[in-house]
Curated annotation (Swiss-Prot):
The keyword Nucleus applies. The lineage of its organism: Eukaryota, Metazoa, Ecdysozoa, Nematoda, Chromadorea. It is an enzyme of class 5 (isomerase). The keyword Nucleus applies. Its EC number is 5.6.2.2. It catalyses: ATP-dependent breakage, passage and rejoining of double-stranded DNA. Its main location: nucleus. Residues 15-158 form the Topo IIA-type catalytic domain. The active site is at Y119. Residues 1-38 are annotated as: Disordered. It is found in: Nucleus. This is Meiotic recombination protein spo-11. PROSITE patterns: TOPO_IIB.
Length: 425
């Protein structure tokens, strides 16, 4: 390893790092970047070799007093690199500190949260957001996910239900009796659970509403989770681990609007613009069970709960339809088209207006469990009661079947195909 001087008093200017395919390359033809060849090297050792090369190369540039410095893992022109001008010296300082911290984690087989890394060199980073920026840059440089660099995420997601985690150096975390914060530490835990499924809901308000309405009593073998909006990397990683390790079926419940459907696609496939930091953080087995825009007719939701689509909604839908077709998401494509035709959207809360525990009993139970008989209720009586009190009811089987057959016509499909061909995303 090479040592170099840091200046902890450098101003911590905001702004993103300049990054591009390098136009500055080593003037030495015998630079050793053979570790990037197709030899079999453990991922940990490969990442460490990349860091060693990057630090040695940047030291050579500093010794040569080059005006513009380039952080790279190879002399190959095809590899991603980070370039710094004299004005970006503060950013370079932070990125080099981050590289050293990551190397230490890998070398000593340790794991650390972003917050812990920040406090190790608080004087250098100045603010948590600057460390976050450096981590993102380093992940892109090394082409490694955050998890592969032993950096743990303290996500904002929570989980509750029939699952217990045995976490090293922490102990027993029982989600049956308390909400559990979803962090990357759960990825390395032992799991005790006899759950039948995991239900992911978009928002914390829906999560709390279901808990208040006795979700655990209705679904004693169920697990409820939320990322409180846009799905963070830690939540996606943990859900993916649970689906792979324990084969839990995972279902998703989101708003019947463009944003909610986009969140579902992000859970299942990752973001449209993927960065190395979160590579692989998606849950391919998740199944969307609602709220569908077409549920407006299935549950006869009151018209007052419908919100008109605005211009940004139409723009988002037009971008999402080609993607849904490419992904083979027939239901998503159909629901987006229905939304355009009817020009309104709904939030999950709209179905709560139909009555107490209505979402759990008549939306979740039939679609997740398909065992309405196991829930101690009398559907016909309750449906009639809700219909009288709040003008909400289930549609008839004929109505439901008719709506299920409401697919996109051939003209629309041709239009969407043209959108795919011209799509810039």
């Amino acid at each position: 390893m090479y040592e170099y001087s840091f200046n902890p008093n450098i101003d911590h200017e905001p702004g993103s790092v300049e990054s591009q395919q390098s136009t500055i390359y080593s003037d030495s033809d015998d630079s050793d970047d053979s570790f990037l060849d197709d030899e079999v090297i453990p991922p940990k050792e490969q990442a460490m070799r990349k860091i060693e090369f990057a630090l040695a190369d940047i030291k050579r540039q500093m010794d040569n007093k080059e005006k513009s410095l380039t952080l790279r893992i190879s002399t190959s022109k095809s590899h991603f690199c980070l370039r710094y001008t004299a004005k970006r010296k503060g950013k370079l300082d932070r990125d080099l500190h981050c590289l050293h911290q990551v190397y230490d984690l890998l070398e000593n087989d340790k794991r650390s949260t972003k917050r812990e890394l920040y406090y190790e060199h608080k004087a250098v980073y100045g603010n948590q957001k600057y460390l976050d920026s450096s981590i993102k840059s380093i992940c892109e440089l090394l082409n490694e996910s955050r998890a592969n660099l032993n950096i743990l995420s303290c996500g904002r997601g929570i989980i509750r239900g029939a699952i217990t985690f045995l976490v090293e150096n922490v102990g027993v975390i029982d989600a049956r009796v308390q909400e559990v914060l979803i962090t990357d530490a759960l990825l390395f835990s032992n799991i005790i659970s006899e759950a039948d499924f995991i239900l992911v809901v978009e928002k914390d308000t829906t999560f709390q509403k279901l808990m208040d309405e006795n979700f655990q009593a209705m679904f004693p073998r169920g697990i409820l989770a939320t990322s409180k909006g846009y799905p963070d990397i830690a939540t996606r990683n943990v859900l993916k681990m649970l689906s792979e390790k324990r084969k839990f079926p995972i279902y998703g419940l989101f708003d019947a609007d463009p944003h909610g459907i986009e969140i579902y696609l992000t859970y299942k496939y990752g973001p449209t613009k993927e960065f190395a930091e979160g590579r692989g953080a998606f849950v391919p087995t998740i199944e969307w069970i609602g709220l569908f825009p077409t549920d407006f007719h299935r549950f006869t939701i009151d018209q007052s709960q419908c919100l008109p689509l605005v211009r940004t909604d139409f723009v988002k839908i037009e971008k999402m339809i080609p993607r849904s077709i490419q992904l083979g998401e027939i239901v998503v494509t159909r629901e987006l088209d229905w939304m355009i035709q009817n020009k309104f959207k709904m939030e999950l809360e709209s179905i709560n207006m139909c009555g107490q525990e209505y979402m759990a009993r008549f939306l979740i139970a039939p679609r997740v469990m398909s065992i309405e008989k196991e829930i101690p209720i009398q559907p016909e009586t309750i449906i009639n009661e809700y219909h009288e009190d709040s003008q909400c009811s289930l549609s008839t089987d004929d109505d439901r079947e008719a709506k299920d057959d409401d697919y996109i016509d051939s003209d629309a499909e041709e239009k969407f195909q043209n959108m795919i061909d011209n799509d810039s995303d």
